[in-house]
Amino acid sequence: MTELKNDRYLRALLRQPVDVTPVWMMRQAGRYLPEYKATRAQAGDFMSLCKNAELACEVTLQPLRRYPLDAAILFSDILTVPDAMELGLYFEAGEGPRFTAPVTCKADVDKLPIPDPEDELGYVMNAVRTIRRELKGEVPLIGFSGSPWTLATYMVEGGSSKAFTVIKKMMYADPQALHLLLDKLAKSVTLYLNAQIKAGAQSVMIFDTWGGVLTGRDYQHFSLYYMHKIVDGLLRENDGRRVPVTLFTKGGGQWLEAMAETGCDALGLDWTTDIADARRRVGHKVALQGNMDPSMLYAPPARIEDEVATILSGFGQGEGHVFNLGHGIHQDVPPEHAGVFVEAVHRLSAQYHN
């Protein structure tokens, strides 16, 4: 593979020295960019965009042409794995993702296949290989998956949810069925991420978007336990380099110590966690990624720069920080405000790296 020209992001995840704090944005390839909207229109619909390696590569690279980002992230969706489990994924206008055949009981779980990542999910691996080729070693490529718990919420609820009553009913009334589902998902995600790594992903991230809706005890048993299983099963070296793993639980700031015990390299923080406090608690063990409120990008440029300065100061001197938003960038953010954010991180962070 091509020599990596900018490895700041990988070095920061491994708590190694860097010249400036690396930065990327969750959902950096997305609807806030007019060029993304044009490519999506060309594809026809969202999943067609995900399943076309050339177009998925194009939208992955679009933000890198605008901004000096330190990493690219595979353009895909967390629901590719449930989709490959034959649940009939479709997207309802204004409703988000839906499944025609949600999981309702143990018998449904027993019928679910574990997808072959180079077969049913081969389009994702083709996208990874295409993106790696087109990146030409400029920056590393991040692969990702949803966490078992987060994927299960969509599969059991039949789509997006606000109250999560259907999956919580299963969790409390039929925990055995839910554990079987989560175990099958953990195996599927491990295979899926390892295939992404073999195809060229240089770091991987597990998005536990809905872990924060659980009690502390349920989080341990139904979310973190299965992410730990995945981390244990991942390839941690490929192409002569360590492959760092980041865990991100939205709303999980109270569980950082337990998350840091999984063997991951870094933890993603949402904007509700104080980064100085997080570093005091787990900075000796893991790197931290985050954590500006994505809505801050609506503010005037000077206010965005102030917030970047505050977060950099909160983390303080030394290595182990990847700057990011605390969740995905909003679709109506002015693209030039994202540019202000990225430039400010690089310019203002040099003083923290000697």
Swiss-Prot record:
Transmembrane segments: none annotated. Its main location: cytoplasm. It catalyses: uroporphyrinogen III + 4 H(+) = coproporphyrinogen III + 4 CO2. Pathway: Porphyrin-containing compound metabolism; protoporphyrin-IX biosynthesis; coproporphyrinogen-III from 5-aminolevulinate: step 4/4. GO terms for molecular function: uroporphyrinogen decarboxylase activity. The record marks 77 as: Transition state stabilizer. One of its GO terms (biological process) is protoporphyrinogen IX biosynthetic process from glutamate. It is found in: Cytoplasm. Its EC number is 4.1.1.37. GO terms for cellular component: cytosol. Signal peptide: none annotated. Keywords: Cytoplasm, Decarboxylase, Lyase, Porphyrin biosynthesis. Belongs to the uroporphyrinogen decarboxylase family. Catalyzes the decarboxylation of four acetate groups of uroporphyrinogen-III to yield coproporphyrinogen-III. Homodimer. PANTHER family: METHYLTETRAHYDROFOLATE:HOMOCYSTEINE METHYLTRANSFERASE RELATED (PTHR21091), UROPORPHYRINOGEN DECARBOXYLASE (PTHR21091:SF169). This is Uroporphyrinogen decarboxylase. The gene is hemE.
